[in-house]
Amino acid sequence: MMFGKSCQVMVKPTGSVCNLDCKYCFYLEKEKLYPDRKNHYKMSEETLELFIRQQIAAQDIDEVIFAWQGGEPTLIGIPFYRKAVEFQQRYCGGKTIVNTFQTNGILINDVWATFFREHDFLVGVSIDGDAALHDEWRVTRSGKPTHEKVENAVRCLAQHDVEFNTLTVVNRTNMHHPVQVYRYLKSIGSRYMQFIPLVERCGENGLAQPQDKHIAMTPWSVDSLQFGQFLNAVFDIWIREDIGDIGIQLFEQTLAAWCGLPPQVCVFAPTCGSAFAMEMNGDVYNCDHFVYPQFKLGNIHQKTLRQMNQGEQNRQFGSDKQRSMAQECHRCQWKFACYGGCPKHRFLPSASGATNHNYLCAGYQAFFSHTATAMSAMRTLYEKGISPAEIKSIFV
């Protein structure tokens, strides 16, 4: 990885504050880092302007992405984002600005949808399947179901021609229903899907930090092999019916690896780094999964994003992924597609005795093995200048 050329920042204007109480949410635990968050949870205009100036200045490429997340980013209100767009236009310097926005959908209405459409926001909606699967975990703070409101949000976005995709957390419940989940997401109009494996461990005082190795999994975490089987079931439908029409992040990333293209998903890159998380007060961390004091890079009021991106701590964090890879990974036939996965998930014992083997290894191996024939065929099409989507005719 070429550190310092560009960086991505997942910015959280409301920190961990959210209007839901999802039973599996790892980010609610981060509120302990900011105990006064309930009184000071909104990013100031000063911090917003400084962030936008620095994010644009930190990029040595022509496209600048702003990724708004949470907590729940709608809680800060539309005027905040109108100001953000104003600052982006003021400081863009001819660069192309792209805004992405990840939401639980609860507050989405015609006003929000109109704003998103007006400014070409790409909106990600968190939804875990149909009502029975979604409402098992994603509930309000009073324990009420949320699926109906989320489905209404999707419908509202579609009516206003807002480009949206879906993010589905694969957990202990919906992992058993891959076909049901996939067909449901298709039915609501999702044309790009992300399937995120839920892997969380529980320490005595809450969720585990990365260095905590010998503690139990949470009961809502996905089973590794079952995650692979989930992906395989979805893949078998997708390649026969929907390739070329529906994008699935993990499938596209795997094909890119087979074709020798640069990884677009940090989980499967050889190194980490330059994919930061920023809290409402300007604190910047190495990664959204490593929002702990020891991984804090600094604050944008004292140090610029470019300085953090080019700094030694970021370089060290990035190269640590490669150095800490398990021995099994170096010998694995799927190393080119996986590179040991996310460091957050490396806590199982490896052959060397170190606790650095990825929890999801069995699932990834099942997926890579199952899809190898199709991936190889699509690579051949790609090398001939033919769209890999043409493989659909072979599998019909």
Question: How should each PLM-predicted stretch be described?
Answer:
Residues L48, I52-R53, A57-A67, I76-A208:
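Radical SAM/AdoMet-radical enzyme domain recognition
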Residues T140-E148, R155, Q159-V267, T271, ...:
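Radical SAM enzyme [4Fe-4S]-AdoMet core and its adjacent flexible, acidic
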